Amino acid sequence: DFMRWEIQALRDGGTAKPVTTNFMYDYQGLDYSKFADDLDVISWDNYPTWHKEAEIETAWDCGLQHDQMRSYKGQPFLLMESSPSATNWQPVSKLRKPGMLKLASLQAVAHGSDSVLYFQIRQSRGASEKFHGAVIDHYGGEDSRVFQEVCDLGRTLKQLKEAAGSNTPKQAAILCDTESRWAM
C-alpha cells in the first residue's frame, strides 16, 4: 500500500512520468509480482558475488533473476543498480576481473534489460559506501581500468541501441510462487 500511496502522490501532483521502484536480488520479504501492475517499468538492483568457486551458478542465478524481472510485466526492465567493480557489503569485496563488467552487463541486456546503471558514479567520501565500487573512484582519473571498461561498455551498448525496447517471445516458463515459498 505504501508504494501505491507514493505513486498516487506523484500522480496527484500532476506528473505523468513513468514510475518504478528498486527490486532487490532474490529478496523474499515481498511478493514483487504484486507490485507489477502499479509500476510502469520494473527495475532491480543486481549485485552478484562473482569470482567464487561456483561462478557458473552465479551466472545461472543472475540470468534467472533477469528473466524474472522481465516476466513481471512481460516487457524490458531496467537494471537500476549494479557495481562496476566491488561491493562494500559482501563477505569479501573482490574487484571484478577484467572483462567481467562487460560480461555481466551484456548478460542483463541479453535477458531484456534496457539499461545498465551503476551505484555509484563517484565513490562516496564517507561511511561504509566509501568502500563500494564506482565509475569514478577516489583517485578520480579517467585512466583507471574500471573507468575505461565503463567507457568501452558504453560504446558497445551504443552499437546495440536497436535492441532497446525489444521483447523476445517466451518459449518456456518457470513458475515462481512467493507465497508458497513463504509457507515452506
Where are these regions (language model features)?
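Active-site-proximal, well-structured secondary-structure segments within enzyme catalytic domains
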Residues: 1
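Short His-Asn-centered micro-motif
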Residues: 21-22
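Short, glycine/polar-rich helix-capping loops at beta-to-alpha or helix-loop-helix junctions
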Residues: 30-31
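Carbohydrate-binding surfaces of carbohydrate-active enzymes
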Residues: 4, 12-16, 25, 36-40, ...
